[in-house]
């Protein structure tokens, strides 16, 4: 019999790194469910927030939760490590809460350099127009902890994940994860292109189905280490069996149905704008939804009704 994470949390003194949207959400939850909570933010602006971490404060902290975007080499993070205080990402914290209060809820995740927000909004449109009890959260929609604690619980959460968040997270597991593309943009934070790729790969390693851009050499290089059985590629070319792609003016699924069969996911003309990168986004969104059993009819309806903000 494992002791409950939430039961243990009641006696924990929690430090939140970051007083932004995520930090505020976490604080609201922890003020009820933890022993005590303190927020550290260098741009201290709320009451009850501190801007500097001192040894005195560290001596009264049991666990730390880090908001997105905090670097691993930040001095505060270093202090926490030296004090042997466990550090959780907000994703892993929310996952542990979910595991107790909504054990049936399933997560899908999405990462990539460009197009994440549009793609996750397409997924949200498929949920909405297919009457799926799910929501998009993280960088779009509500925070992950708010989505997890929503009553009644959602069946599905679709998370837009940055490399920052993936690098910090070890516990969360996904029904499906998608890698849209990899451009060399966040190298400063990760230190090298290699570690940036590794952060992206982390999502696919902990996903049952790994959806990846078959037209992106960087992305395909990153997934070489994965079990090929679980990889589903999306492509702007004609899809082979086990992939999703384009056949003339149709988006077609040859991955989530019987061998040799194909189903239409969307008409090209229903994607607005039907420019290549946006068609790729639609294929990724469709594949994520097909991976959790959403019908191609519902996918089609969601894409048709989606317009860019």
Describe the function of each predicted region.
Residues 62, 101-109, 243-253:
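Short, surface-exposed amphipathic charged segments that create phosphate/polyanion-binding patches used
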Residues 1, 153, 238-239:
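Residues that act as N-cap/strand-start positions at coil-to-secondary-structure junctions
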Residues 5-12, 17-19, 190-194, 229-309:
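Adenine nucleotide phosphate-binding catalytic loops in nucleotide-utilizing enzymes
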Residues 19, 42, 112-113, 139, ...:
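Cofactor-binding loop segments of dinucleotide-utilizing enzymes, especially the Rossmann-like FAD-
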Residues 22, 67, 162-163, 235:
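Short linear Ser/Thr-Pro motifs
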